[in-house]
Amino acid sequence: MTAFGGLKVVEGCSLQKGWSIMEKRYYIAYGSNLNLRQMKMRCPTAKVMGTAVIKDYELLFKGSLTGAYLTIEPKEGSEVPVAVWTVTEADEEALDRYEGCPVFYYKKDMELDIRGIRTGKIRKRKCFVYIMHEERKIGIPSLSYVRTCLEGYISFGFDEHYLSEAQIRAVKEAGYED
């Protein structure tokens, strides 16, 4: 593991050695995996633990040959609302495949103060998050991808301006602004 911006980077996408099948792992979602319907299909045993905010990071749409997808990158003074899921080993393997880890996204560990979904109680937990490789360029997402993410934002009661700001930046950087 290496440190970056105060976070530990988990090299590659293999599961942590010694991870017990009974141990809970906490996964941070900020994009399409906020969508409850989609997560139920992809990771049927995952459970929503709560919500949190990643401070000093911003939400961006970045691209590949197949389109533009959300990622987060460090930016002082910014923040990103997230949901935190408990996942099993099988769920994490499904997420690795979906996220294209380690080629498209890589994993980082971070500690977050998570507000429990049922109790509202704040708990500090070590979680993992997928982050797109930084050299990817800003891109314009498909409407269907944005809708999927927006459904998740609505489900969790997140302010939609974070998503809108990421879209506006993508359009401006692509040269489509008036």
Segments predicted by a language model, with ranges:
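Initiator methionine at the very start of the polypeptide chain
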Residues: 1, 21-22
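Short, Lys/Arg-enriched N-terminal segments with co-localized hydrophobic residues
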Residues: 11-21
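Glycine-aromatic micro-motifs
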Residues: 22-178
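Intrinsically disordered/low-complexity terminal segments and short unstructured peptides
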Residues: 1-2, 70
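N-terminal amphipathic/hydrophobic targeting modules at extreme N-termini
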Residues: 2-13
